[in-house]
Regions:
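Solvent-exposed loop/turn and edge beta-strand elements of beta-rich ligand-binding domains
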Residues: 32, 37-39, 54, 84, ...
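Beta-strand-rich modules
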Residues: 51-72, 142-165
């Protein structure tokens, strides 16, 4: 499982390989070549790694190999299947207008390669944000507002693929 978000990081997760004593993580910006080892995990029970060396708007390719020590010699198992991750740019709200019947009309920019957007709102900038909409739309009408209350909004783009990637 590989997940990505708009905070310029990719989190990789994998299933434990029997008798593995660690894992090597490889990344490339090409699907078939140019892979470089970006991390060595020294524990066979560690099954996640967060790559903070990515940039939004770029596509990366990852593969993982289990590592072993057999009779004092280091060895590596076969590579996992190469997985593609598109790190999406962050969505940005460009318009919030007051509509009829005390509603707010919120619009945001589309993000290339996004399959949808999650809009969340709160009544305090650093408060708990509640998801208001998850869809492919780039606008939302927020109704049932309380007069005199200030509302805060955040939007993030995501991409769902068959391999579970979400940005």
């Amino acid at each position: 499982q590989i997940t990505s978000d708009s905070k310029n990081q990719v989190t990789l997760g994998w299933k434990k390989v029997s008798k593995a004593q660690g894992y090597d993580i490889y990344r490339s910006d090409e699907s078939n070549s140019g892979f470089e080892k970006i991390a060595s995990i020294s524990s066979g029970s560690t099954l996640t790694y967060t790559d903070k060396g990515v940039k939004s708007g770029n596509t990366y390719y990852y593969k993982i190999a289990a590592t072993y020590k057999i009779k004092g010699s280091a060895g590596r198992g076969s590579y996992s299947k190469v997985t593609e991750v598109a790190v999406l740019k962050q969505g940005s709200i460009y318009s919030i207008t007051l509509g009829d019947n005390n509603v707010l009309n919120i619009s945001w920019n589309s993000v290339a390669n996004a399959s949808g957007y999650e809009l969340a709102g709160a009544v305090s900038e650093k408060g708990t944000y509640t998801t208001l909409q998850t869809s492919g739309a780039t606008s939302f009408t927020h109704s049932n507002l309380v007069q005199g209350t200030t509302y805060y909004y955040k939007v993030r783009a995501y991409k769902d693929l068959s391999n579970g990637i979400r940005s």
